[in-house]
Design a protein with these regions (language model features):
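Glycine-rich phosphate-binding loop signature in dinucleotide/nucleotide-binding domains
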Residues: 50, 111-113, 170-176
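Flexible loop/turn connectors
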Residues: 173-273
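Residue-level detector of anion-binding/catalytic polar loops
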Residues: 29-30, 77, 114, 150, ...
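Hinge/beta->alpha junction and helix N-cap segments in small-molecule ligand-binding domains
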Residues: 4-13, 35-40, 93-103, 119-166, ...
Length: 273
């Protein structure tokens, strides 16, 4: 399994890794963790050229991802959690970020919100072409345009301090914003602190929604109206697809684009004022 090269994985990324290990163990397979990207390119290349594994699961996919091209050239079975811009005949599992974020925006519009913001992932990930960030942006802007909303997209690093600073920046630059959509679960504790510091009651004075793993959405106060990132289901599907390839190299490539329901909790409400 190839997780992202990072000094610290987010809680959801760790859940993906643990879920892949668990799903592989059911089939009596072991999992080798090896990061890729940046200084880890040689490690990735050793796995590809040395055939040290039967197959690969890639995480954190870019729209144009050289790792995908390299594995395709090598003929090594692989599945991506996420998908490139033009996946063609490949094996992958993903969440429909564009569709889900679009639905979040429409939900806010139905509640009367007219000025909204997307709290996205980091500048670095967006610049690199990280799939969920760019697809979320597209879904957000398209839905906002269709509903005639004033919309802003801001990047935020994956940590609480960045979430706090990001939300305070939003309040300073666009005081008319009454609702936010996010895919950045790691920034949520900081966003919550910023809401408290600004004395903004959720959802009476401000609404918040997005694509966030259920357990994190439920830990927020008040619990977030959000679509789940079903890490265990996605990991299980990725392992199943990889084993299908390994057992039958001639199998027709398959993929799964998941569209979890948006669970209405307590963080969105009608716009006031």
């Amino acid at each position: 399994m190839i997780p992202p090269a990072s000094t610290r994985l987010t809680d959801v990324q760790l859940e993906f890794v643990a879920s892949v290990v668990e799903a592989a163990a059911v089939h009596d397979h072991d999992v080798l963790l090896s990061p890729s990207g940046g200084d880890h390119d040689r490690s990735f290349e050793r796995i590809v050229t040395g055939r040290r594994v039967d197959g690969v699961i890639l995480m954190e996919i870019l729209l144009a991802d050289p790792r995908v091209d390299r594995l395709s050239q090598a003929g090594l079975p692989f599945v991506t959690i996420g998908h490139v811009e033009h996946p063609g005949a490949s094996w992958w599992v993903d969440v429909d970020y564009a569709g889900l974020i679009s639905r979040c925006v429409r939900h806010l519009a139905d509640l009367g919100h007219q000025h909204v913001v997307l709290i996205n992932r980091s500048d670095e990930l967006v610049a690199a072409g990280y799939g969920p960030a760019l697809r979320s942006t597209a879904g957000f802007l398209e839905a906002a345009g269709q509903r005639g909303l004033t919309a802003h997209n801001v990047c935020c690093a994956d940590d609480p301090a960045a979430g706090l600073a990001c939300f305070e920046q939003i309040r300073e630059r666009w005081p008319g914003v009454t609702a936010a959509v996010t895919i950045n679960e790691a920034a949520l504790p900081g966003v919550q602190r910023a809401l408290h510091r600004a004395a903004l009651d959720v959802p009476r004075a401000f609404s918040l929604t997005g694509v966030i793993a259920d357990r994190l959405a439920e830990d927020f106060y008040p619990p977030l109206t959000a679509a789940d990132v079903p890490a265990r289901q996605m990991a299980r599907l990725a392992v199943d697809l990889l084993l299908e390839q390994i057992n039958d190299p001639s199998a027709t490539p398959r993929h799964a684009l998941l569209e979890p329901a948006i669970t209405l909790r307590s963080s969105t409400g009608a716009r006031h004022g």
